[in-house]
Amino acid sequence: MDMDNQNTKIYTDKFLAVTSLLFVFISVAGLAIYSQESIKIAATWMQWTTSVFTTPVLLFAFLAIIFTFGLAFSKYGKIKLGEGKPQYSTMSWIFMFILSGIGSSTLYWGFLDWAYYYQTPGLSLPPESAEALKYSVAYSFFHSGLSAWAIYALASISLCYSYHVRKNKGLSLASVIEAVTGFKSTGVVGRLVDLMFLLCMFGALTISLVLTAVTFTNILSQLTGIPNTFMTKVIIILAVSVLFALSSYVGMDKGMQRLSHMVCLGVVLFAIYVLCFGPTQFILNNSLMSFGLMATNFVDMSLFTDPMGDGKFTREWTVFYWLWWISYAPGVALFVTRVSKGRTIKEVIFAMVIGGSVGLWFIFGVFENYSVYSFIHGAVNVPQILSQQGGEVAIGQLLSLLPAGKLMMWIFLGIMVVFLAAHMDAVGYAVSATCTRGLSEGQDPSPNARLFWCVMLTLVPIAMIFSKAPLDTMKTATIVTALPFIVIILIQTYGLVKWLIQDYAKVPSHLIEQQGYDDQEIGLNQTQDEHAKRMQLELASSIKLDRKTS
């Protein structure tokens, strides 16, 4: 770390923290006091926003894939993000940012996502038909695959480049916006951006935390007879917060790494168990067919606006999912930036888009197809239970059918708790980093700040549980907070393109690659000016050499 970084004053932006909490407390009070009115307003707002912004959201997600893969395969993909060797092993690195990007509700959607699409299918298919069932898992693969992770990559690369290559101080969105537009991160625009980010994190975490708490307490009640009440759910949420606190105090290097390894290993082993002791042949066959259906219909799924119909599926699922991923994108970008020093742009893009997609396809392929098989053979009527009793009841019944069912239910609960703690750790880090001014490369917000924000992040989900808000209301919390970030990510991307052209447009591909090797060996720690001068000298040497040989 250079002297300039060491002398930077680190402090908490109290105005930003207090303002964001004020908004949160008002929202919580509204949900608690005016529950039914809030639910009705949320339903109206969701209908309007998803109808108006369908086309822009679909185009944004589709173009994100084109841009990120184009960047990865270009010469700019060889640019190294920071000097020296990577701080984390490749496996730990991938585990950590995958967990920052997917919530513990993945275990909920992993068993039930297909059932929603079976009841209300896309591509104008008849509801609850053989065709709807055929495409149900394919659509789940689509919503958890390339487009989603490309959105994360698009938001992450610009922040990584600003922080590690351009050496812009401050690990927050406002710092990037300041570097691109000139608006001060501590000014009105900068604070508005960070305020929207903080509120976005509260909205994004709501669905994950609520679905996890509801599923956990239902299965726990089946196993132990403990009443499945509001207080039980609150106790579970607070218990997870304590686990998160332990992770925060241990630190990023030990706490988050350990949690991420525990979760990923636990989920993979659990999926392998279901694959081996469940309907193995059906799971493999339907997973392969679903992947093929997704691949052959990818463009149709990406751009399906349903102008001849009511567009309900696109609004309620594809647009919702893309906005949910967008709502998490800024937080994921902050976390990915923190753990990606020493990686190349291509490595970050491929690890996120390919690694993240394949990981979720495996999990969803196993869990969903086990659920589909149970439905087809009459063991568990998942769609009916989902509609009448709730998805958490269906998951409990599905788990109980496995060999050593009760043991598997306990293991599932353990994985779910650690999964949520790891996810909250990542989100808490992003939020506390945003409220901490002056962070330079390699510096982290204090454990106390991360713990404080973790507790605050539980307020909105607890209010949702108290008001018995339906899934659509929780979706609205995500959608409303996510929309502005399409514009912010586009501004980040504009800045990234501008910086790449300024810094590397005239630098040959082999010199960019060579610089990465040199930095890894020497461990250079250059400022922007030193970096630019070095590039100019190498370019001049290359031109002279070409002239001599010609």
From Swiss-Prot:
TM ranges: 15-35, 53-73, 92-112, 137-157, 196-216, 230-250, 263-283, 317-337, 347-367, 401-421, 451-471, 477-497
Keyword Cell inner membrane: yes
Topology class, membrane: Multi-pass membrane protein
A GO CC term assigned to this protein in UniProt: plasma membrane
Domain of life: Bacteria
Any one Gene Ontology molecular-function term assigned to this protein's record: transmembrane transporter activity
Principal place of residence: membrane
Activity modulation comment: Inhibited by the protonophore 3,3',4',5-tetrachlorosalicylanilide (TCS). Not activated by osmolarity.
Cell compartment(s), UniProt: Cell inner membrane
InterPro entries according to UniProt: BCCT_transptr
Disruption phenotype: Deletion of the gene abolishes growth on carnitine as sole carbon and energy source, but does not affect growth on acetate.
Keywords linked to the UniProt accession: Cell inner membrane, Cell membrane, Membrane, Transmembrane, Transmembrane helix, Transport
Xref: PANTHER family: BCCT-FAMILY TRANSPORTER, HIGH-AFFINITY CHOLINE TRANSPORT PROTEIN-RELATED
Family: Belongs to the BCCT transporter (TC 2.A.15) family.
Entry function: Catalyzes the energy-dependent uptake of carnitine and is essential for growth on carnitine. Can also mediate the uptake of choline. Is probably a proton:substrate symporter.
Name of the protein: Carnitine transporter
UniProt source species: Acinetobacter baumannii (strain ATCC 19606 / DSM 30007 / JCM 6841 / CCUG 19606 / CIP 70.34 / NBRC 109757 / NCIMB 12457 / NCTC 12156 / 81)
Source organism phylogeny: Bacteria, Pseudomonadati, Pseudomonadota, Gammaproteobacteria, Moraxellales
